[in-house]
Amino acid sequence: MTTQGKIRLGVPVVEMGQGIYTSLAMCVVEELEMTLDQVEHIETVFHTAFANPVLSYFTNDKLRIQMTGGSTSLMGWGAYYQEIGATAREMIINAAAYKWNEKPHFLKINGSKVVNQVTGATLSYGELSEQAGQISIPQKPKIKKISKFKVIGKPLKRWETLSKINGTASFGADLDLPGILYGTIKHSPILG
């Protein structure tokens, strides 16, 4: 989370038209009571930590690879991203509690702010982001009940669509590294 209160969200799967960037962002903003326009997607590095959870599960961890396909992205990552949002929410609330010297149960979140229900004071997520980064990570954050959902399950515009339309979206073919060499087939050796 930035000091402007935006989320930089890494997604370890490829957006191929299935809407996964939006879906996983929805899982996080649901828990934080934010909006999709407060999310910025960033690329993740290749690492076994980002192995496809569904594929790993069904192969007893024999195939721990980072892969997109088979409709496994949301099934595999959705609950993890909700937990990321819930963890961030609890850390932000705890940062506000520390700043106000107040018990966390007297605080609530509302529109990217923490509200002190005793004094009425508010602090934005941006104001709390650095302090929240110093808070111990909760081991079992409380996930919202389905009945409380405001984002998940609701029709929303996909937040990455504009970048695809205006050409600013980044794809694998856009990779540019210092000294990179590109290769292509000049002419296919066979017809068809």
Feature-to-residue mapping (PLM):
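Cofactor-binding beta-sheet edge motifs in enzyme active sites
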Residues: M1-G192
